[in-house]
């Protein structure tokens, strides 16, 4: 696990019927480590569950962090616990900030596209954009105004930089048809929106599009597929991975302390190095180059036998 810190809940706010915002302070230090907009932390719950949340607070305020938690009816209980039991005074463990999504410093213009709870990584980017005097616009899609977290604050802060799309589909192909030189586009939202963004920006210059995934494949699907085997390079042990179990489960049962947070192939916490064999990738976080030498243990599988650098 990444470096952990003790944190305390000092405020909570019901942003929408399904989204609660928690304000955290460090329990044993004066300030949190520095981060850039778009970073996330992993919260460790009392039962050991680990959940990834974007930091929504201003990076220039290191004395407090804020996260927004969407209550997921089909989740594994982590979001429900935070909604029901994380009262003021509750202590948790949190990882140091992790930066997989960030503003491109070389960009002349930024287009930010969010769907629902996908607005959260952008909330910590907006203060950076304002301080830099940057050229930017924000497109925010939601099923209804009641389900659009932080919408009143965004309208007040952004004015005509904000375009809101309520109960209507944003025409990504039209919006992103002609990338101006120096423009970078960023997207975070439901899988369908992210896929549409990828298709609409397929012709953009390499390195000018950026995606944060909040969903991958369901955990039940990760536990389905053909059986395969893994060889542990350090010991030569052969571990069978049955068709109805994930590689992560098998590795942990064998005593290998592989980290994990989202467990749907989006965060990269459970990446293991592959020395041989053919992985069957199901993640949404690894680049093509990274996939040649690593895989996510939570959702990806293998064909035949894999050799892992463990």
Positions of the model-derived regions?
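Ferredoxin-reductase
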Residues: 2-91, 95, 108, 142-145
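FNR/FR-type flavoprotein reductase catalytic core
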Residues: 79-236, 240
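A short, compositionally biased
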Residues: 36-38, 221-228, 266-268
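Local cysteine-cluster metal-coordination motifs and their immediate loop/turn environment
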Residues: 121, 252, 256-281, 287-304
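N-terminal pre-ligand scaffold of iron-sulfur
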Residues: 224-260, 273
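A short, sequence-level motif marking secondary-structure junctions
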Residues: 37-39, 56-60, 243-248, 285-288, ...
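Short hydrophobic/aromatic patches at helix-to-coil boundaries
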Residues: 307-310
């Amino acid at each position: 696990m990444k470096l952990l810190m003790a944190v305390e809940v000092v405020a909570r706010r019901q942003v929408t019927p399904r989204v609660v915002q928690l304000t955290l302070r460090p329990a044993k230090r004066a300030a949190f480590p520095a981060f850039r907009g778009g970073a996330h932390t992993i919260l460790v719950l009392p039962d050991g569950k680990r959940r990834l949340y974007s930091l929504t607070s201003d990076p220039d305020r290191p004395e407090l962090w804020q996260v927004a938690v969407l209550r997921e009816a089909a989740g594994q209980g982590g979001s429900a616990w935070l909604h029901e039991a994380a009262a003021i005074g509750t202590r948790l463990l949190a990882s140091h900030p992790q930066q997989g999504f960030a503003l491109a410093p070389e960009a002349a213009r930024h287009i930010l596209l969010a769907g629902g709870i996908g607005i959260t990584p952008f909330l910590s980017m907006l203060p950076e954009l304002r301080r830099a005097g940057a050229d930017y616009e924000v497109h925010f899609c939601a099923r209804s105004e009641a389900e659009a977290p932080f919408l009143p604050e965004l309208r007040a802060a952004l004015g005509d930089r904000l375009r809101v799309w309520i109960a209507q589909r944003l025409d990504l192909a039209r919006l992103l048809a002609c990338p101006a030189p120096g423009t970078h586009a960023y997207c975070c939202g439901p899988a369908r929106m992210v896929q549409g963004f990828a298709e609409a920006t397929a012709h953009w210059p390499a390195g000018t599009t950026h995606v944060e995934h909040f969903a991958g494949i369901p955990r039940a699907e990760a536990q389905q597929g053909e059986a395969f085997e893994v060889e542990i390079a350090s010991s030569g042990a052969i571990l069978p991975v049955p068709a109805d179990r994930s590689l992560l489960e098998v590795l942990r049962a064998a005593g290998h302390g592989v980290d994990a947070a989202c467990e749907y192939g989006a965060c990269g916490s459970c990446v293991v190095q592959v020395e041989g064999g053919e992985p069957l990738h199901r993640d949404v976080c690894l680049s093509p180059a990274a996939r040649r030498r690593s895989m996510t243990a939570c959702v990806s599988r293998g064909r035949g036998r894999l050799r892992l650098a463990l």
